[in-house]
Amino acid sequence: MLPSKILLIGRNYADHVQEVFNQSASTLPPTLFMKPPTSIIGPGAAIKIPDFAQKVEFEGEIALVISKPCKNVKKENWRDVVLGLTIVNDVSDRNLQFAEGQWTRGKGIDLSLIHI
């Protein structure tokens, strides 16, 4: 079963912000972006880099898995909706990612979010 959407937070790690953006994390706040369900592949599956990709990079991430549709969950009720944590490998084409104001094209390549 694939999720209906995948929400991610970017620029949330100070050293990585400095490395990728050459700016301090205090001057460049975190941002929210999405990956489509078609970006998911399973453990051990081959990453298929598209021919048009020019600057492909990857990042290990911790993913929070939500078990059911939810909205406005009170913090004391988080266990009602959180299934667990997992590790993913977030693959991006940096040229596409930074060519526009938002990151969907560079982060949303099919088969670019690997569940480990």
Give the residues covered by each predicted segment.
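Extended, compositionally biased flexible segments
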Residues: 1-60
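Short helix/loop capping segments that flank catalytic or ligand/cofactor-binding pockets
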Residues: 17-18, 43, 73-75, 95-97
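A generic local secondary-structure boundary/capping motif
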Residues: 20-22, 48-56, 70-77, 102-107
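Short Gly/aromatic-enriched secondary-structure transition segments
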Residues: 20-30, 75-86
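Short loop segments at secondary-structure junctions
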Residues: 37-38, 67-71, 91-92
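Conserved small/polar residues in nucleotide/adenosyl-binding loops
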Residues: 114-116
